[in-house]
Amino acid sequence: MKKTLIIGVTGGSASGKTSVSHAILETFSNERIAMIEHDSYYKDQSHLTFEERTKTNYDHPLAFDTDYLIAQLKELQYGRAVDIPIYDYAKHTRSQETYRQEPVDVLIVEGILVLEDERLRDLMDIKIFVDTDDDVRIIRRIRRDIEERGRTLDSVITQYLEAVKPMYHQFIEPTKRYADVIIPEGVSNTVGVDIITTKIASILND
């Protein structure tokens, strides 16, 4: 069985990780390729009240059920389909729904902390860090969380100052040293994206 190529894409919140991941997906649209978001593996908090959920630090490694992600990645590597959880950002907990992911040749794993856990890093063939200026990221995050995730401006700013920014410097930025490639400014860095896609193509063609 052909080994699944696993690509980790990380960086700070709103750094452009998803855009870089989608650029890879589009480049290899004729291949069996898929993307899994680490956000899907936020721990189930249905046992907590909504107010308690809003106080969770979602940028801390303990907010994620990374063991579950690792287990499902291994299942996919063995050629077995998995049911991936869906996270509800508005309710701050895991949805009761899942989606079916079949085995693929190329799997992108995207999220702010996908390089933080050594066990997860060890599953990856290519590790990418998207490096974007803090000011750009906070502006993007405000727009995204208000428009797409039903958040208020005050809640976004409070979360950024109390959790997002300090967690970035404590947990996310240090993982840059594990990256094989660092892409400044995300998908707008076409040279960086081209280098990545060229490397992926060479591996697939071996």
Curated annotation (Swiss-Prot):
This is Uridine kinase. GO terms for cellular component: cytoplasm. Pathway: Pyrimidine metabolism; CTP biosynthesis via salvage pathway; CTP from cytidine: step 1/3; Pyrimidine metabolism; UMP biosynthesis via salvage pathway; UMP from uridine: step 1/1. ATP binds at residues 11-18. It is an enzyme of class 2 (transferase). Belongs to the uridine kinase family. Its main location: cytoplasm. Its EC number is 2.7.1.48. The keyword Nucleotide-binding applies. It is found in: Cytoplasm. It comes from the Bacteria. One of its GO terms (biological process) is CTP salvage. GO terms for molecular function: ATP binding; cytidine kinase activity; uridine kinase activity. It holds the Pfam family PRK. It catalyses: uridine + ATP = UMP + ADP + H(+); cytidine + ATP = CMP + ADP + H(+). PANTHER family: URIDINE KINASE (PTHR10285). Keywords: ATP-binding, Cytoplasm, Kinase, Nucleotide-binding, Transferase. SUPFAM superfamilies: P-loop containing nucleoside triphosphate hydrolases. Signal peptide: none annotated. HAMAP family: Uridine_kinase (MF_00551).
